[in-house]
Amino acid sequence: MARVKGGTVTRARRKKWIKLAKGYFGHKSVGYKVAKQAVVKSWTYAFRDRKQVKRNFRKLWIARINAAVRPHGLSYSQFINGLKKAEVLINRKMLSELAINQPQTFEKLVKLVQGK
């Protein structure tokens, strides 16, 4: 019986990795070994950055809220503490949206916190 080297299976497997590396720069989109390494690394980055997106958005919302309450003589932490004491349950994303899109409503919240 003749030896079967499995060329079609190997080619298909390598082609799959090359296809996943489509759009990569240089040899990463052509060479099998480098393409496979690049794809696996990109999956690692994607996994890590899916977690970081959540952190980054929270940082952005906090920065926006802080920028909106500073002109009223409050810091971010004082504002959030005041909201908790006033039993206002609005998350940071919504507070950020209010500060940008509806400044009058946001000012009412600030006045509520200040006790005016």
Swiss-Prot record:
For whether the record's keyword set contains Ribonucleoprotein, the answer is yes
Q: Which GO terms describe its biological process?
A: ribosomal large subunit assembly; translation
Name the UniProt key words of this record, in alphabetical order: Ribonucleoprotein, Ribosomal protein, RNA-binding, rRNA-binding
Extract the Pfam families matched here: Ribosomal_L20
Q: Domain of life of the organism in this record?
A: Bacteria
The entry sums up its family as follows: Belongs to the bacterial ribosomal protein bL20 family.
Q: What is this protein called?
A: Large ribosomal subunit protein bL20
Species name for this entry? Mycoplasmopsis synoviae (strain 53) (Mycoplasma synoviae)
